């Protein structure tokens, strides 16, 4: 958003630097939140510890409902919770004037999508074995294998596009919406828009986390079918 002031431009004015700078800022925020929440842990959680614990319990509950197993939900908690933190703060930081959302760059959303893609395939192969895992792609009948296998491959590859472009498109659209609102009425119009953009930041985070659990569930639950 070239028409808006960005703090990163005070250091270096470059399109790629803007997103790299803000992603590093998000990474620092995530580390600080984790550090502050665990530095003085109490039996009865308060403050930031209480918020983070509630968030983690929510992630576990989401995983338990999706995977059907609390053990698996806790196993994948570090991945899903970290992705949730990164995506949320990346979405939310762009709402603050002078900052840009790292998730409005396809570079970050595609990277996150590829991490999820390769990890759930890795977990599927690890649990079921290489041949059994990819044999599932061929469908229930050998006669349908020549048709089902390429369809399944395309279906899985499309998940990369779905994960990355959904997040990128929504956040980029939010940034452009905010730009228009700030241009038309910089003092009054953005106030209700900020509430809407915050809601969208939370919603897109939830969708990305939920889909991560769904893809993991499909990969590790093959032997149960």
UniProtKB/Swiss-Prot annotation:
This is ATP synthase subunit a. One of its GO terms (cellular component) is proton-transporting ATP synthase complex. It is a multi-pass membrane protein. GO terms for biological process: proton motive force-driven plasma membrane ATP synthesis. GO terms for molecular function: proton-transporting ATP synthase activity, rotational mechanism. It comes from the Bacteria. Key component of the proton channel; it plays a direct role in the translocation of protons across the membrane. InterPro entries: ATP_syn_F0_a_bact/chloroplast, ATP_synth_F0_asu, ATP_synth_F0_asu_AS, F0_ATP_A_sf. HAMAP family: ATP_synth_a_bact (MF_01393). Belongs to the ATPase A chain family. The keyword Transport applies. Pfam families: ATP-synt_A (PF00119). NCBIfam families: ATP_synt_6_or_A (TIGR01131), PRK05815.2-3 (NF004481). F-type ATPases have 2 components, CF(1) - the catalytic core - and CF(0) - the membrane proton channel. CF(1) has five subunits: alpha(3), beta(3), gamma(1), delta(1), epsilon(1). CF(0) has three main subunits: a(1), b(2) and c(9-12). The alpha and beta chains form an alternating ring which encloses part of the gamma chain. CF(1) is attached to CF(0) by a central stalk formed by the gamma and epsilon chains, while a peripheral stalk is formed by the delta and b chains. Disulfide bonds: none annotated. It is found in: Cell inner membrane. Keywords: ATP synthesis, Cell inner membrane, Cell membrane, CF(0), Hydrogen ion transport, Ion transport, Membrane, Transmembrane, Transmembrane helix, Transport. The chain crosses the membrane at residues 16-36, 79-99, 105-125, 176-196, 202-222. It comes from Campylobacter curvus (strain 525.92). The keyword ATP-binding does not apply. Its main location: membrane. The lineage of its organism: Bacteria, Pseudomonadati, Campylobacterota, Epsilonproteobacteria, Campylobacterales. The gene is atpB.
